[in-house]
């Protein structure tokens, strides 16, 4: 679009706004808005009891979550939004402050994390993989990558998933094939595209997503200006840790939690148990090793465990809402 065309659009927007004498509100890119973004975030801050001293961090984190390539702005208004949950849990770390940190037992040790990035983009094939949260340790040596799950395993348990042909060669390598076979997930060899088949309905997308995130950890961040701080953190870190973080609904569903427990064990059986073999296959496939130590957690982290290890971390209304 040329500058002349941009100016024409700008003139139309000004005409609309002036017709009802709306105040002038601009986005970061200079486009005219009907409402200040803070009006929208204020509703979330009020509903979940975000204190005024955390307003700046919440607003900035909200923007990072909702303006990502995942189009989370269309999803965050759901009561069971998978975008909202990590935002409410980790937003305080988006703008680092002295004395603000959480403690987690990951990678075989207890680490303090003082910085959070949302929707970080790493190179995979074509489109990047977007990891929900990346937590940076206080010493900058470790980044913990978290893929948040709330109800996805209920919505997308299936016996078959099809993906593009560009992934086929990677998945045909013995390290990944044996990992999938551990849960009787087969690859349709005669197909051009990658087709995963399972005897029983399972959350196959969660496994494919984890493997894509691991590719991204090996290949590194997508080089864009809006990720400069994350890129600096990635380059500085010596160790990268990956795990899903799940919301455990068993206190709500009691005995009817098969999908949750199935995915918890699915991740452990495929990714957790065979993590090193999967990483070796990825490094061979991309013909690259970034020199960083990549650690894959054996079992998923849960929001319940995070809360137990950090009992005073969450805002009270957030704890009540999610039963944490």
Give, region by region, the residue ranges found by the protein language model:
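Nuclease-adjacent, charged terminal/linker segments that flank catalytic cores
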Residues: 1-119, 324
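A short, conserved, highly charged catalytic patch centered on acidic carboxylates
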Residues: 133, 149-160
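Acidic, metal/cofactor-coordinating or nucleic-acid-engaging core segments within structured domains
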Residues: 155-243
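Short acidic loop-to-beta-strand element that houses the catalytic metal-binding Asp/Glu
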Residues: 128-136
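Non-catalytic C-terminal interaction segments of nucleic acid-processing enzymes
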Residues: 211, 215-324
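Active-site beta-strand-loop-beta-strand hairpin of nuclease catalytic cores
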Residues: 135-145
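Short, solvent-exposed loop/turn segments at secondary-structure junctions
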Residues: 118-125, 149-153, 221, 247-252
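A short catalytic or substrate-binding loop motif that flags glycine-/basic-rich loops and adjacent residues
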Residues: 81-83, 124-128
């Amino acid at each position: 679009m040329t500058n002349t065309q941009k100016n024409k659009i700008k003139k139309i927007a000004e005409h609309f706004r002036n017709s009802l004498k709306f105040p002038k509100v601009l986005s970061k890119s200079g486009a005219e808005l009907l409402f200040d973004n803070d009006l929208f975030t204020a509703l979330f801050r009020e509903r979940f009891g975000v204190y005024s001293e955390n307003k700046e961090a919440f607003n900035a984190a909200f923007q990072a979550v909702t303006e990502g390539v995942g189009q989370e702005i269309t999803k965050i208004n759901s009561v069971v939004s998978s975008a909202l949950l990590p935002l409410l849990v980790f937003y305080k770390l988006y703008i680092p402050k002295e004395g603000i940190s959480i403690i987690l037992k990951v990678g075989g040790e207890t680490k303090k994390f003082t910085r959070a990035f949302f929707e970080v983009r790493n190179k995979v094939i074509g489109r990047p993989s977007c990891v929900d949260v990346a937590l940076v340790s206080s010493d900058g040596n470790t980044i913990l990558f978290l893929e948040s799950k709330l109800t996805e395993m209920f919505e997308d348990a299936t016996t078959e998933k099809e993906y593009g042909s560009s992934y086929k060669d990677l998945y045909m390598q013995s390290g990944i094939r044996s990992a999938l076979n551990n849960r009787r997930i087969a690859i349709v060899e005669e197909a051009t595209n990658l087709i995963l088949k399972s005897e029983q309905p399972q959350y196959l997308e969660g496994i494919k997503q984890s493997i894509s995130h691991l590719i991204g950890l090996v290949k590194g961040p997508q080089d864009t200006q809006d990720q400069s701080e994350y890129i600096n953190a990635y380059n500085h870190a010596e160790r990268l840790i990956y795990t899903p973080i799940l919301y455990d609904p068993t206190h709500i569903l009691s005995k009817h939690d098969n999908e949750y427990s199935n995915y918890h064990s699915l991740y452990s059986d495929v990714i957790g148990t065979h993590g090193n073999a999967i990483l070796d296959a990825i490094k061979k496939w991309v013909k690259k090793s970034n020199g960083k130590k990549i650690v894959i957690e054996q079992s998923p982290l849960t929001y319940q465990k995070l809360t137990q290890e950090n009992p005073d971390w969450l805002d009270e209304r957030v704890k009540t809402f999610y039963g944490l």
